[in-house]
């Protein structure tokens, strides 16, 4: 905040403040204990993938100062929005949507019905965020003890402490339908296929690949440190999710 303020003050001194668009965002969040991940981003969950987006654009956001937009968007939608505002052409292959309407009216209903999130670096997961729900489907645990399905009520449980998958199998089924719909609309036409499935076929994330020497070393360490149950599950399921 301190250094941003210095930039803003300099813009004002140079009489550029009213001619400069300010956009603040990020690439990902950091879990602080959620899903037993500390100070890192290892899952396709809400905390990791909900990023800030603060926009001040003279002539666009003037009538909407200090407001919050609750609609759902991808980061890639920002590029499409900037293109629209600046009257730049957008390639037909771009998947982003324009959300300029939300910048002028925070009550706009112009948003995505749901968001699908993929993670293939520290685990192999695909999730879907809709309404107040988050469903996470785990394909490779990345040496953790994630179950196959995790369902969270983000409004009541923002830190993802209570997995409701067993209590709401109808919502799990609906979430998987949305994920399948997204895969059909996006991955079937991808030039190089589904990258998440590529990681799974190769044996899982690099640090937890079942074909690497690290795999057995880690499992042996678990056995030597009173975590034999977890070691047995990893040997049995080869990194795939298992029931607790």
Report each predicted region and the residues it spans.
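Secondary-structure boundary motif
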Residues: 13, 105-108, 166
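Histidine-centered active-site microenvironments of extracellular/periplasmic hydrolases
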Residues: 10-70, 74
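Extended amphipathic secondary-structure runs
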Residues: 1-14, 22-23, 79-81, 241-244
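Active-site rim elements
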Residues: 40-42, 62-72, 85-91, 160-167
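Short, hydrophobic alpha-helical segments
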Residues: 8, 12, 82-90, 183
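A structural signal for well-ordered alpha-helical segments within the folded catalytic domains
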Residues: 1-5, 48-49, 73-80, 94-97, ...
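C-terminal cap/loop subdomain of S1 sulfatases and analogous C-terminal strand-loop tails that border
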Residues: 28-34, 76-79, 84-154, 159, ...
